[in-house]
Amino acid sequence: MQYIKSNDGIKIAVYDYNLKGKQTVFLIHGWPLSHMIYEYQISLLTNCGFRVAAVDLRGFGKSDTPACGYTYNQMSADIFSIVQRLKLRNFILVGFSMGGAIALRYMNIFKGFGVCKLILLSAAAPCFTQRSDFPYGKTVKEVNSLINLAETDRPQLCLNFSKQLFASPHSDAVIDWFK
């Protein structure tokens, strides 16, 4: 693990595996997770000969937790700082949930700098809430309930979220791992 400073001076934790891999896969996690959500994928990808770069987004994992700067624009700028520092070119960018939205913002703002392929996994994009022209996602009422729970009982919110990550039941130990 290494820290890479973002354009606003925040230390971002970056994990770089199998530096001699044939091609790089860059993994961006979703909320409220860290790069560890990709633990099994990192192992598989490196065993298949890929270099894997993974990030703990600002406020998550071992990255700094600043009071502000949690916009998709800033987080995509963080990704750009990492891409530049690691000298990544011709890499596969993967984003899960909020990480997918950040990956899309990166593609837009930085014109896909260095990216040869984009993989979105259950991306929170193009938007998170339902609209008249976008019937997917959560209703405004559901999002307001999530915000209220985040303000009043964050551990319960994270527990509820962790249970939604799986298509089939898992042990309490696995659920605890996501808290």
Model-derived features with residue positions:
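Short acidic-hydrophobic surface loop/beta-edge motif
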Residues: 2-7
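Conserved HGGG/HGGXW glycine-rich cap/lid loop of the alpha/beta-hydrolase fold
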Residues: 8-68, 82
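Structural signature of beta-strand start/N-cap positions in the alpha/beta core
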Residues: 24, 51, 89-92, 114-117
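Conserved acidic catalytic loop of the alpha/beta-hydrolase fold
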Residues: 73-91
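Short beta-strand immediately N-terminal to the catalytic nucleophile in serine-hydrolase-like folds
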Residues: 93-95, 121
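Gly/Ala-rich beta-loop-alpha elbow adjacent to hydrolase catalytic centers
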Residues: 95, 99, 103
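Flexible "cap/lid" loop of the alpha/beta hydrolase fold
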Residues: 104-152
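Conserved alpha/beta-hydrolase catalytic His-Asp/Glu region
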Residues: 129, 133-138, 148-179
